[in-house]
Amino acid sequence: MDTNISDEALKHQFKQIQTFVAGTTASTAHVVPISAKLKYNIDVVIQLLSHIPQPKRDLLSPPRCIVFKSIESNINSVIDNNNNVNCVIASAMLIKGVINLGQVIEVKPGVITKTQSNEIKVTPIYTHVIALHSEDNALLYAVPGGLVRIALRTEQTLMKAEKLNGRVIGVPGKLPDVVVKIVVRCCLLKRLMNVKRKDGDESVGEVKLHEMLLVNVNACSVGGKVVEINGEHNNEVMFELNSPICCEIREKVAVSRKIGKNVRLIGFGEVISTVTIDDSDI
């Protein structure tokens, strides 16, 4: 709330906020009136932020990283030495575990190809970590909390720029399966966000059979065709994915639909079952 308004308007905004968050996890949250220009109550906001508890980090499980962005590079741009080694730098979020310098890791799904019979084949990539950075700090190991840059030594033809986006990095044999279909228990939004239609209709509308939607799992965005709709409330949707992804049960999912020229969020959910690629295909 900003206090550069009248007292009556301030009280009205406060009531609007209370109504908006009623029945949610934010219903008991603090509402602090501030003035960024006059710096009123900024100290109160900082004090409240300092009392937010630190999340518990899982340091004992095998490490798992989700890649948000990847670029090709030369090792000289990562660490200061005379080695002329090509590498791929992955900007990733470490979800759990500890990843160490020099550790052997696996990248899933890895290289995705199609056979002559149009069947999908996935080949995981095995490599090792040659550098770790957090901002400008070189690391010997990385723990969960914030982004980390991981330099991987491998052939750049296998992992060209941006091709690692949405991939999962971890200990060989400890990563989730590669899946081609997922069943998501969906919860659709009550109305579209930031969408104005000429007819004034802001409803999301039901998910339709054979509809193409955009599915976001972790940092991976992939098209998904609706092939089945089940459940007591028709909220269990099976998506046939355009490209294999690496995920497991209970992963959080965002579902979007193309509306006009833009893609808009229409719902969210979690994975309740998957269809994996056989081990013989990997």
Residue spans of the language-model regions?
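Conserved C-terminal guanine-recognition region of P-loop GTPase G domains, centered on the G4
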Residues: M1-T28
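C-terminal effector modules of nucleic-acid-centric enzymes and ribosome-associated factors
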Residues: N4-I5, Q156-I282
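Conserved catalytic-core segments of large NTP-driven translation/proteostasis enzymes
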Residues: T19-L192
